Each structure stands twice: as C-alpha cells, then as structure tokens.
C-alpha cells in the first residue's frame, strides 16, 4: 500500500510472525483453516484468497476448507440471531 508503507510492512510482519512461528501449539493447517473461517466472516476477499491458498499449501482438502467456511457462517448467523433477540427485548422494554 503506497499511502501507508510503514503500516503495511508492520501488518505483513505480524502476519509472518503469527502464521509461521514454529513454537505455536497450532500447526499451519489449523491456523490457515481458522484464518479461512475468519476471512469468510469478515468478508475480506484478499484474506479469503491468501488463506485458502495457504490452507491448500498446508495440506487442506476441499472438505476442510468448506467446513471452515460453514462453521464461520454458522457462528456469524448465531451472532446475528442473538442481536435480533436483543432488538426484540429492547422493543418490549421501549
């Protein structure tokens, strides 16, 4: 990113540190599948591309990537439902 090279360099360094640390209790495949799920939930096209490719390189198959996407969709839907219930509770109290 031309406008903020320092920030971009820091972000990429953080990415490398977290995703490539060897003393982590999570292996690369697990990290990438978690990242795929989060990327789907945050709706970041760049992140989806990077982490699906990373998951594939770490050994993920299509079913694992699909499961990560579906789990994140489920959790996201659950959060939306909970906020809907909150809206209805507030409506009852108003």
For each of these PLM feature ranges, what is it?
Residues 1-32, 83-94:
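Acidic, glycine/proline-rich low-complexity segments that act as flexible tails and inter-domain linkers
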Residues 8-10, 50-64, 88-91:
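Iron-sulfur (Fe-S) cluster-binding segments and ferredoxin-like electron-carrier domains
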Residues 19, 35, 52-56:
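Amphipathic alpha-helical segments within well-ordered protein domains
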Residues 27-28, 45, 62:
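Alpha-helix N-cap/helix-initiation sites
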Residues 30-39, 66-74:
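Alpha-helical scaffold segments that form or flank carboxylate-/histidine-based iron centers
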Residues 34, 38-50:
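Short, thiol/selenol-centered motifs that function as redox-active sites or metal-ligating centers
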Residues 66-89:
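C-terminal structural segments of small proteins and small subunits
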